[in-house]
A protein has these predicted regions:
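A solvent-exposed, acidic/Ser-Thr-rich amphipathic alpha-helical stretch
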Residues: 62-118
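A short hydrophobic beta-strand element
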Residues: 116-126
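Bacterial N-terminal signal peptides that target proteins for export
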Residues: 1-7
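Cleavable N-terminal signal peptides
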Residues: 8-9, 19
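Short, cysteine-centered beta-strand-loop-beta hairpins and adjacent loop/turn segments enriched
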Residues: 98-101, 128-139
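Short beta-strand edge/turn micro-motifs at domain boundaries
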Residues: 23, 139-167
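Short, low-complexity N-terminal intrinsically disordered segments enriched in polar/charged residues
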Residues: 21-63, 67, 71
Length: 168
């Protein structure tokens, strides 16, 4: 095989694999099982993260946010304000999230939960419209990372971008 043939075959093989490279991101069957750790500090932070995910983000129980977020709560999402009051206002007033009283199981799909020192990162599947093809969708992974101080989230990061203005 000549070098030219080898390069051509390699290019065609890589092109074919690129067209079929993406596999959907899939969550685990029991996401709550990922929020446990044998290390007491990591377990406390993972459990607080579970409450943030379940009671706050899933069920909108923002009246309880002070149980798991500090007053300072440094927010790095460009759409939400920092501070406990700021993030509560963002979810309850700006997004209009309604409170659900029954909240006994996390239903959000979760791929993995990673804890290291004061940080907990949750990886979740996300599906978006494919901008290259009308009606098609693609999958990717969203993440939320929190830094904990004394068992409460004090700082948050995610890959959010600035939301477009609301349609008038």
């Amino acid at each position: 095989m000549t070098i030219r043939t080898f390069v051509l075959v390699a290019a065609l093989v890589s092109l074919g694999s690129a067209l079929h490279a993406q596999e959907p991101v899939v969550g685990v069957k029991d996401p709550e099982s990922l929020f446990k750790d044998p290390d007491p500090m990591l377990n406390r932070n993972k459990q607080a993260t579970l409450h943030i995910m379940r009671e706050l983000l899933q069920c909108g129980q923002w009246d309880r946010a002070g149980e798991w977020l500090t007053q300072a709560y440094h927010q790095h999402n460009p759409n939400a304000a920092s501070g406990l009051a700021g993030v509560v206002t963002f979810f309850t007033k700006v997004l209009g999230v309604k409170r659900q009283d029954k909240c006994d199981k996390l239903t959000t799909e979760v791929v993995a939960v990673i804890a290291d020192d004061a940080y907990v990162t949750v990886l979740m599947p996300r599906k978006y419209p494919d901008p290259r093809k009308a009606g098609a969708e693609y999958y990717t992974t969203w993440f939320d990372t929190w830094r904990f101080v004394n068992g409460k989230a004090d700082e948050h990061w995610d890959p959010a971008t600035i939301a477009p203005p609301a349609a008038k």
